[in-house]
């Protein structure tokens, strides 16, 4: 009996050691600058990527990034194509029906962006205008619930950078996007100078949830606990601030 218990203990220890050292496959959508995008030589980078690497370091795993179009993120996770999603995915009630989430690692608002010559006094004032959004995003959910119902034409895209290409081409009047993503990307680049934020910052929980977290399959309780603890650790040890300050001028962790 003692030999059996000893063997079981050794097996458990080996399994734990193996889990700690193995790769963690992380899904990203590399079209969402400055959160996830590619360098000139094709390597993934951005706030989400750096956060993922910091979390992997804390839990003694190695991040292996898997590129996935946004609307296939959760189906790919459920199909076990990767272990987690670390790609600015908001924690919403709808998503929690399918997957689990760690604690949040940032929380920033979204906002409507329109051409400067368009007068905005509320959704009704842009009836007939055409707004582009990322398919399966919280911004799409908001646009369908609050803008389309007021007569705004909502067009969904597979990637956010496709939205900006069509805005520049004159096929769209604007977008709804994360304030940091669009502010640090499209609005600050050539082609974005004729567009601006309108209306209030959008934090509506039924659309935008409670911040971005790491998505996992249900039943991965131990990994979920480890990642949430790792988020707290990098907040405490200064790694989070170093990453944050590389991309942003204020703490995006939020309230």
What does each model-found stretch correspond to?
Residues 61, 89-90, 95, 102-151:
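A conserved helix-loop-strand patch within extracytoplasmic ligand-binding domains
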Residues 30, 107-114, 191-228, 248-255:
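Periplasmic-binding protein-like
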Residues 57-58, 66-67, 71-84, 98-100, ...:
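Short helices/loops that flank or line small-molecule/ion binding pockets
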Residues 50-58, 120, 129-130, 135-138, ...:
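Extended ligand-binding regions for polar small-molecule ligands
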Residues 38, 52-60, 139-158, 164, ...:
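Ligand-binding cleft/hinge of the Venus flytrap
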Residues 72-75, 87-97, 142-146, 173-208:
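A ligand-binding cleft/hinge motif common to bilobed small-molecule-binding domains
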Residues 20-88, 250:
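Extracytoplasmic small-molecule ligand-binding "clamshell" domains
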Residues 62, 139-155, 193-197, 228-255:
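Ligand-binding clefts/hinges and TM-proximal coupling segments of bilobed small-molecule sensing domains
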